[in-house]
Amino acid sequence: MTNKIILALEAEQMTKEIPTFAPGDTIVVQVKVKEGDRARLQAFEGVVIAKRNRGVNSAFTVRKISNGVGVERTFQTYSPQIDSMAVKRRGDVRKAKLYYLRDLSGKAARIKEKLS
């Protein structure tokens, strides 16, 4: 049984509004980046290849191709470093973890769009 105090603290930290997204979706994550004394927002757009739902410990992994090189970044869902998230495109996939996309390139790595 989880302690009521821990549950209350976790509920307090999970107040951020998160859009519903799933593996296969293309999302844009606005990340707060601090360079020296000034802060700015950096957009990271890519396909969600994994999602982990564990309350305040939830995380998701986004993959994009930058200059012909695959770049993956794992974000903590309720991190204060994330300013905002937006779903650009819904993907139609049948798996929860899309790690097989790491081995594919070009047209083979495309994901069908979900028709709804």
Swiss-Prot record:
UniProt key word Membrane: no
UniProt cross-references to InterPro entries, sorted A to Z: Ribosomal_bL19, Ribosomal_bL19_CS, Ribosomal_bL19_sf, Translation_prot_SH3-like_sf
Pfam families: Ribosomal_L19 (PF01245)
Keywords assigned: Ribonucleoprotein, Ribosomal protein
GO biological process: translation
Domain of life: Bacteria
GO CC terms of this entry: cytosolic large ribosomal subunit
GO molecular function: structural constituent of ribosome
Family: Belongs to the bacterial ribosomal protein bL19 family.
Role: This protein is located at the 30S-50S ribosomal subunit interface and may play a role in the structure and function of the aminoacyl-tRNA binding site.
Cross-referenced HAMAP family: Ribosomal_bL19 (MF_00402)
Name the record gives this protein: Large ribosomal subunit protein bL19
Species of origin: Pseudomonas syringae pv. tomato (strain ATCC BAA-871 / DC3000)
Taxonomic lineage: Bacteria, Pseudomonadati, Pseudomonadota, Gammaproteobacteria, Pseudomonadales
